[in-house]
Amino acid sequence: MKKLVLSLSLVLAFSSATAAFAAIPQNIRIGTDPTYAPFESKNSQGELVGFDIDLAKELCKRINTQCTFVENPLDALIPSLKAKKIDAIMSSLSITEKRQQEIAFTDKLYAADSRLVVAKNSDIQPTVESLKGKRVGVLQGTTQETFGNEHWAPKGIEIVSYQGQDNIYSDLTAGRIDAAFQDEVAASEGFLKQPVGKDYKFGGPSVKDEKLFGVGTGMGLRKEDNELREALNKAFAEMRADGTYEKLAKKYFDFDVYGG
């Protein structure tokens, strides 16, 4: 009887482990908008590169699955995830209350503050008084767009939405908008530290609103994909513990991108 109970226990344990493994797809289709350097963009060979891309590849390796990247505009990523056209989102996606009503997230991958970028000779600050009558560029589907439309647009500030962060910077340098509003790190590394951004600066301090901007960024998943989320969280915790996360981050940043 003891042998029978032991054998049955082993079978149940194996079946449970097998079921959990089977719940993780052999190939994960990861949606991304490759216009947001240094997190996701394309190099001169047309290859996807960036911190998010490196993180996703490492996470997929650790959970023993293949990852395929699917390019989409940011505002199409959540609808694509819910429609099962993709299995995950890795695109500097802030973890916000509103988004958590629609999808699930992994644990925080890194911090995300939002700031204005303006010309060096500009005195624009992120206040209603300073921005009134100005045109502010934002990326469609971002928390910055939501904040601008809720807090600034009703006060006489024109919020101009774009598909593709590069289009925002192009209009900023051409003088068609007065400021660009985006993630602080993306603006610093992807624009201000590049030759094209030499005549620009941050306009004032970061804009704080935990309800809209969330508590950091994560990988977006469907709510029902609990096993996948747990596996990714475990793999990410291991990356943080063994130094892999820090090694990848140092390729792109000279500061603690994870934050407090």
Swiss-Prot record:
Function, as annotated: Part of the ABC transporter complex HisPMQJ involved in histidine transport. Binds histidine. Interacts with HisQMP and stimulates ATPase activity of HisP, which results in histidine translocation.
Cellular compartments annotated: Periplasm
Organism, scientific name: Escherichia coli (strain K12)
Gene name per UniProt: hisJ
Keyword hit for Disulfide bond: yes
N-terminal signal peptide: 1-22
Keyword tags: Amino-acid transport, Disulfide bond, Periplasm, Signal, Transport
Protein name, entry field: Histidine-binding periplasmic protein
Location, primary (coarse class): periplasm
Swiss-Prot/TrEMBL domain comment: Has a bi-lobal structure. Contains two similar globular domains separated by a deep cleft wherein the ligand-binding site is located.
Gene Ontology MF: a single term: amino acid binding
